[in-house]
Every structure is written in C-alpha cells, then in structure tokens.
C-alpha cells in the first residue's frame, strides 16, 4: 500500500493513482493549479464569451449541466451575474435509488433564483431496463445516467442553437478518480458507448 506524501490518501481507494512523486491525483491537481493566474483566465473567458454576442432572437446565451449540488448553484449564479449571460440549466432527474432530498431542493432554489431548469427523466421501466443492461454489460448499473447527462447538454445546445456550453469541474482531478479523467479535463473522452 502506498500513501500520498501530501495528504496520506492510500492507493487502495478505487480508481486512485499516484501519477507523480507519490502524490495522489487530487493533490497533484492542487499543486498544478496552485499558481494559476485566475485574473488572466477571466480575461480569456471574457474574450471567449465576446465571440458569441447576445442575440435577441435567442432566449439563452449558454447552457450549463447541473446536478443540484452546491457547485451547480455557484456556477449558475457566477455565469449569470458575473458574465451577464442568460443560461439554460439542464439536469438529469435521478431515480429514487440514486437521489436524496438535497438535489431537488437545490434545483427548486435555482428556479426560485430565476433560472430556467430543463429536467430530463427516465420512465421507471426505462430506468430499470437501462440499469439492468448497464450492469450486465459494464458492471455499473448507473452508467446510463452518467452518459445521459454528458450527452443531453450538447444535444439541447444544438436543438436550441445555444452557442456556449459550460461544464463543471473534473471529478477525476478534484476527487482523485482516474476513471473519469479525459485527455484535456472532463471532455467526454471516457464516454465510449
């Protein structure tokens, strides 16, 4: 068993790895981003946003995939209030087996804050059929819901002609799960089926 030299996390945690100098991937990410010039990144982000001027014929300027977690609320507020964009929020409604009361409460809060939230739900039968299929074929009965949110956001962006998509953080970098890491961050490279 190996330990992270910074946080003492162990390599026996599922999907963990220690890419550099006995650091877990979460600590490695922390040290990589410690000296990031966020003021420069804000300028870059603002320049990207300027490439997609507001269009009065379009109801939304951007789209954000949200889960109902605290990060979703922060991200939506920041994009609306700091970047002055009109976002459409997209959420995959999870079945009772995978949700608690906090997510729906936070989504209600987003609606009360003036956001439009597009929720996508499976029928109970469809959810069970997909869960069974994913368990048998991938060993992960929730894989269908993980892939659904990654595909739903771009599909709705195309459908409603929304030019900008905002994604949240990469859980592999932030939480240390190497199975979710893509080539350039959380870019969908692990979505294979």
Where in the sequence are the language-model features?
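ATP-dependent adenylation/nucleotidyltransferase module used to activate substrates
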Residues: 2-193
């Amino acid at each position: 068993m190996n330990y992270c030299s910074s946080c003492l996390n162990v390599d026996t945690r599922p999907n963990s790895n220690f890419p550099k100098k006995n650091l877990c991937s979460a600590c490695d990410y922390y040290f990589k981003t410690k000296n990031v010039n966020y003021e420069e990144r804000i300028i870059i982000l603002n320049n990207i946003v300027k490439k997609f001027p507001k269009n009065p014929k379009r109801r939304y300027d951007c789209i954000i995939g949200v889960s109902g977690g605290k990060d979703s609320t922060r991200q939506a507020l920041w994009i609306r209030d700091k970047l002055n964009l009109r976002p459409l929020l997209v959420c995959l409604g999870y079945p009772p087996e995978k949700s608690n009361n906090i997510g729906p409460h936070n989504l209600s809060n987003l609606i009360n804050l003036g956001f439009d939230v597009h929720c996508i739900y499976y029928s109970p039968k469809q959810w069970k059929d997909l869960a069974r299929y994913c368990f048998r074929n991938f060993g992960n009965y929730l894989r269908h819901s993980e892939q659904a949110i990654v595909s739903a956001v771009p599909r709705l962006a195309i459908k409603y002609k929304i030019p900008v998509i905002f994604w949240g953080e990469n859980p592999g970098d932030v939480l240390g799960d190497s199975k979710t890491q893509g080539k350039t961050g959380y870019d969908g490279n692990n979505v294979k089926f």
